Amino acid sequence: MQTAAVTEAPYQVFWAPGCTSCLRTKEYLKRQGIPFESVNVRTDPQGMAKLQAIGASSVPIVARGDRFIYAQSLEDLKAFLGLDGEAEQKLAPAELIRRADIVLAAAARYMRQMSAEQLDGPFRNSWAPPRGIGHHVFRIAEAYLEAVETPCELTYEMTMRGTYEVKPGDDVVGYGDGIRARLAAWWQENSGRDFSVMVPTYYGEQTLHEVLERTTWHSAQHTRQLIVMVESFGITPDQPLTQADLAGLPLPEKAWDTD
């Protein structure tokens, strides 16, 4: 009597348009040649219900059967997928802070180039208008500061706080200038701290170094989206981010997810 072979369930990737880690996760699985079922929680009527049914609450999620992982950390994702390989080298904390400053300054420049109508209108499949995306760039850095200064767990809600409430005319650039100054001041006081310590986040325990790296590249990816927006309006970006500005950051290949 023959026994039927047991086939493992395929991987599923739960994602949403405009989500930076979602795009990076899908690109990573494709590079590794790993097939997956794509579940866009914004367009699939059952997408969010499926995500919540396995016990998750936000994207990106990589799942297989009843197991899942929040995919913000590539190292955690590799472990979940059973992939070997050396851990990717991170930029030093001082360099990450320098890059974050470049990114925050750039985001403010691009927002200044857009009109009020452009800032507050819908854009492609974006989850927020340009003014909201700009706010999120700065809020990501502010959430990092709040988590390390309190200290407390870095939650998903912290990274999104205030972004959906942004209204036409809100001075997001002024808000961003304040966050940029706060980050610089924090570094002046904390450049000597131990960045190998573990800190709690909504995607699991991570080193402070990992959280700072994610803060930097997460803001950078959304700033790349602002460049796409500016260019789409027929405007030449004021000092576009260069390859040197972004080198060494674990960014997605694409600036905009067109899936």
For each predicted feature, which ranges?
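Short, charged, low-complexity loops and linkers
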Residues: 83-96, 164
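Thioredoxin-like thiol-disulfide oxidoreductase module
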Residues: 39-57, 81
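Non-catalytic, surface beta->alpha helical segment in thiol-disulfide oxidoreductase systems
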Residues: 64-89
